[in-house]
Amino acid sequence: MDRTFVMIKPDGVQRGLIGQIVARLEDKGLKMVAARFERLAEATVNEHYREHIERSFYPSLKQYIMSGPCFLMVWEGKNAAAVVRTLTGATNPSEAAPGTIRGDYGLDIGRNVIHASDAPESAAREIALHFPGTGQVTYTRIDEPVLYE
């Protein structure tokens, strides 16, 4: 099974959307294997979003991510990164399809509720950054034999 990283951003936490987002991922058959609240430090934000540091929007993105607690999670399932990205929807909520997390809950591109790794490689990097060596569990959900052959 593959693992991917998901972060509910400060606007999602403040709006009480954690339960709805977790339910959508679980309803899809994914399994949460790690989770915690954290107010991210500047160094962690810089490493997480390192590909955006030189972009003009980065200072406001960093301020937003550091403005409140985030809910960090690792999810497991077949093609986990691709499945979660599909459920998440387009980065810009105005372009995200209804029924996706951003389509239903995102307000604008600057307050889009959720981050999800875009590929297995970035998932591995983000999991190592946010859950280094500890905090992940292995278990079998009762429905796994039905969901996965």
Curated annotation (Swiss-Prot):
- Which PROSITE patterns does the protein's record reference? NDPK, NDPK_LIKE
What EC identifiers does the entry list? 2.7.4.6
Q: Which SUPFAM superfamilies match?
A: Nucleoside diphosphate kinase, NDK (SSF54919)
List required co-factors: Mg(2+)
What is the annotated role of this protein in its UniProt record?
Major role in the synthesis of nucleoside triphosphates other than ATP. The ATP gamma phosphate is transferred to the NDP beta phosphate via a ping-pong mechanism, using a phosphorylated active-site intermediate.
* A single Gene Ontology CC term: cytoplasm
> Which keywords appear in this protein's UniProt record, sorted alphabetically?
ATP-binding, Cytoplasm, Kinase, Magnesium, Metal-binding, Nucleotide metabolism, Nucleotide-binding, Phosphoprotein, Transferase
Enumerate the catalysed reactions.
a 2'-deoxyribonucleoside 5'-diphosphate + ATP = a 2'-deoxyribonucleoside 5'-triphosphate + ADP; a ribonucleoside 5'-diphosphate + ATP = a ribonucleoside 5'-triphosphate + ADP
Molecular function terms, GO-annotated? ATP binding; metal ion binding; nucleoside diphosphate kinase activity
Annotated InterPro entries: NDK-like_dom, NDK-like_dom_sf, Nucleoside_diP_kinase, Nucleoside_diP_kinase_AS
**What family does this chain come from, according to its entry?**
Belongs to the NDK family.
The name on file for this protein is Nucleoside diphosphate kinase
The organism's lineage is: Archaea, Methanobacteriati, Methanobacteriota, Stenosarchaea group, Methanomicrobia
Main localization (coarse)? cytoplasm
Q: Quote the subcellular location field of this record.
A: Cytoplasm
User: GO biological process annotations for this chain's record?
Assistant: CTP biosynthetic process; GTP biosynthetic process; UTP biosynthetic process
Output the HAMAP family linked to this UniProt entry: NDP_kinase (MF_00451)
